[in-house]
Amino acid sequence: MATKIDKEACRAAYNLVRDDGSSVIWVTFKYDGATIVPGDQGADYQHFIQQCTDDVRLFAFVRFTTGDAMSKRSKFALITWIGEDVSGLQRAKTGTDKTLVKEVVQNFAKEFVISDRKELEEDFIRSELKKAGGANYDAQSE
């Protein structure tokens, strides 16, 4: 059966993360049978990492605040998590299903495909987002 996405519900969750006035900084999109639907959401990145278990595949849209004291900016990441115990067929479908997620999640600085929990570490993601941002005008850098 072909995978579908609940666009309205996923778009509402996506917009919640994009809203600077919202405390929600991440949302997951998970499979409910053959339909991608919004999953959990929260204000603590560590709680997001707990969703990424070895038997799960999911997509996540995450907001990070970057910059220095003079200039704070929101940067967004699209993360595809594929757990170690996910079957080969499901792994393959995840790549094609991501196109459905990208119909909703259209604005992000960097995309990640991760199956190793070490790569989910907040410092690693922040570092990659900083590299994707181009020139570094941080006053503390030399």
From Swiss-Prot:
UniProt xrefs under InterPro entries: ADF-H, ADF-H/Gelsolin-like_dom_sf
Any Gene Ontology biological process: regulation of actin filament polymerization
N6-acetyllysine PTM sites in chain numbering: K102
Residue numbers spanned by region Flexible and important for F-actin binding: 66-75
PTM-bearing positions, type N-acetylalanine: A2
Subcellular location: Cytoplasm; Cytoplasm, Cytoskeleton; Nucleus
The keyword Nucleus is assigned to this record: yes
Similarity section: Belongs to the actin-binding proteins ADF family. Coactosin subfamily.
Description of how the protein assembles with itself and partners: Interacts with 5-lipoxygenase (ALOX5/5LO) in a calcium-independent manner. Binds to F-actin with a stoichiometry of 1:2.
Known role: Binds to F-actin in a calcium-independent manner. Has no direct effect on actin depolymerization. Acts as a chaperone for ALOX5 (5LO), influencing both its stability and activity in leukotrienes synthesis.
Annotated protein name in UniProt: Coactosin-like protein
